[in-house]
Amino acid sequence: MIIDTTEIETINSFSKLESLKEVYGIIWMLVPILTLVLGITIGVLVIVWLEREISAGIQQRIGPEYAGPLGILQALADGTKLLFKENLIPSTGDPRLFSIGPSIAVISIFLSYSVIPFGDHLVLADLSIGVFLWIAISSVAPVGLLMSGYGSNNKYSFLGGLRAAAQSISYEIPLALCVLSISLLSNSSSTVDIVEAQSKYGFLGWNLWRQPIGFIVFLISSLAECERLPFDLPEAEEELVAGYQTEYSGIKFGLFYIASYLNLLVSSLFVTVLYLGGWNLSIPYIFVPELFGINKRGKVFGTLIGIFITLAKTYLFLFIPIATRWTLPRLRMDQLLNLGWKFLLPISLGNLLLTTSSQLLSL
């Protein structure tokens, strides 16, 4: 039997080519994910710097100024310091729950970014249930906080975890009802479709003007979900030392620190997408590339402008939660629960009823 070596070489080269295609396919699939993670990380560093500068301005003092120009690298310096600190585990706690809790809190928030459109056709996963996927994923984060509080075997930590779970349940429902009203108004639950539905009449087409009640409820509920003042009861320093973070140190404490700012950024991005027109320039009858005198070949420039508009709206909105931190006093736990169940829930239900009625009458 004579074996043709050329055929064997052809088969081997073909198999190598197929394996290379698979490797390139995996790499190409990971590129947008890694790009999104890098962008989110830079965005969080910018938020930390902005909060410190705005807080310093409100308190009439000088903010960070030594780590980099204008103190822009201060957050990076703090993160590096936490990396080199020792990770302590309570001797009487549950080490598995203690270690898994911070990871669940961070990963669940990271997944929420997958459905956020940063520009036209610039979204990691354009799903038909995008906004409700965010609601579902954000409900997982308090489970990690409760696990952290229970695994610490500390009364302050456990009470902080219970507060985080109760607060999340109380404000998740009004938040979901506001999102449902937006979905009914836009006839879609896709984040991309919701942005495009607001693009017809410039800034007059924003859902902010069509859903003012829902916007206020969404704003208050998102602040409570982010555990920002005046809703920071799960980690109230005067009562619970640091809440569920009391026993944490090093990188695990840093994960909670990152999670709080990740949650703040994702909430602001969803406010931009749901109520402020997303990536649209919001000037009627003007398309971004045409405004800057470029033709359809300038899609890259148009995409960059869309990203810039989205981030500009997001960071301008961030002034509200940062200012409320130094303006409003902390609520009591009974006041927080009463606000969620007795005020925001009926108001959001009434807003949903009004939206449904208006949509039925317009048919």
From Swiss-Prot:
Species, as recorded: Atropa belladonna (Belladonna)
Membrane-topology annotation of the record: Multi-pass membrane protein
Main subcellular location: plastid
GO biological process, one term: aerobic respiration
Transmembrane segments: 30-50, 98-118, 127-147, 165-185, 248-268, 269-289, 300-320, 336-356
EC number in record: 7.1.1.-
Function: NDH shuttles electrons from NAD(P)H:plastoquinone, via FMN and iron-sulfur (Fe-S) centers, to quinones in the photosynthetic chain and possibly in a chloroplast respiratory chain. The immediate electron acceptor for the enzyme in this species is believed to be plastoquinone. Couples the redox reaction to proton translocation, and thus conserves the redox energy in a proton gradient.
Database matches in Pfam families: NADHdh (PF00146)
Annotated catalysed reactions: a plastoquinone + NADH + (n+1) H(+)(in) = a plastoquinol + NAD(+) + n H(+)(out); a plastoquinone + NADPH + (n+1) H(+)(in) = a plastoquinol + NADP(+) + n H(+)(out)
Gene Ontology CC, one term: chloroplast thylakoid membrane
Protein name, as recorded: NAD(P)H-quinone oxidoreductase subunit 1, chloroplastic
Signal peptide: none
Tree of life domain: Eukaryota
Subunit-level organization: NDH is composed of at least 16 different subunits, 5 of which are encoded in the nucleus.
Keywords associated with the record: Chloroplast, Membrane, NAD, NADP, Plastid, Plastoquinone, Quinone, Thylakoid, Translocase, Transmembrane, Transmembrane helix
An annotated Gene Ontology molecular function: NADH dehydrogenase activity
Localization per Swiss-Prot or TrEMBL: Plastid, Chloroplast thylakoid membrane
Family statement: Belongs to the complex I subunit 1 family.
